[in-house]
């Protein structure tokens, strides 16, 4: 009989302890929920890069066979530009050249032209802002015995042209029927200049 009473007493004590534990836990949850909100500051430091060519523009090679008629030869030239400045000031692609010569033979100083605007596309892996180009075409590549002052052949207006993008002009070389045969060479200079 005594053992049964003790067992019941122990059972009641266990229940009481569980009730007390539940109440204590509930109080802790209420205390945690009542804590005031905390604010913090997130910082992202973005360092400016530079304006330049991703890789040096490649050579442009024209080829034609004289056939007694005036000819126009077309050749494309991908130009990979990187504007990592983060400034949004825009940029200009300028060009100049020396006259095509083969010994004493020369082509016209207006032989090389662009009849339309170059194409422009973001490079793979670059979420770029395509350049807004304001150059009027056709464009004639400046040429002379000594390269004259460079002129703009393509540009990016303010807040455009950010990231890496490839500009592809389709150059046209005029070869009159009276052109003498030979291998003509010309030195071209392409430059990137900051500003709209």
Predicted features and spans:
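Signature of Gram-negative chaperone-usher
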Residues: 34-196
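Secretory targeting and sorting signals
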Residues: 3-36
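Exposed, low-complexity/repetitive linear segments and helix-based recognition motifs
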Residues: 2-8, 80, 117
């Amino acid at each position: 009989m005594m053992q049964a009473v003790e067992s019941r007493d122990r059972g009641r004590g266990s229940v009481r302890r569980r009730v007390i534990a539940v109440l204590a836990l509930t109080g802790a949850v209420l205390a945690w929920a009542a804590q005031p909100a905390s604010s913090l500051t997130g910082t992202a430091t973005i360092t400016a890069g530079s304006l330049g060519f991703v890789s040096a523009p490649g050579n442009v090679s024209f080829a034609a066979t004289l056939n007694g008629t005036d000819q126009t030869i077309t050749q494309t030239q991908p130009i990979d530009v990187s504007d990592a400045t983060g400034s949004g000031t825009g940029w200009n692609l300028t060009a100049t050249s020396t006259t095509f010569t083969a010994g004493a033979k020369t082509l016209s100083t207006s032989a090389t032209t662009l009849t339309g605007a170059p194409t422009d596309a973001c490079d793979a892996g670059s979420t770029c802002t395509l350049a807004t180009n304001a150059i009027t075409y056709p464009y004639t590549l400046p040429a002379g015995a000594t390269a004259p002052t460079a002129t703009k052949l393509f540009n990016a207006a303010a807040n455009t042209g950010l990231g890496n993008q490839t500009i592809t002009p389709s150059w046209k070389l005029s070869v009159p029927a009276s052109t003498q045969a030979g291998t003509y060479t010309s030195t071209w200079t392409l430059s990137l200049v900051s500003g709209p």
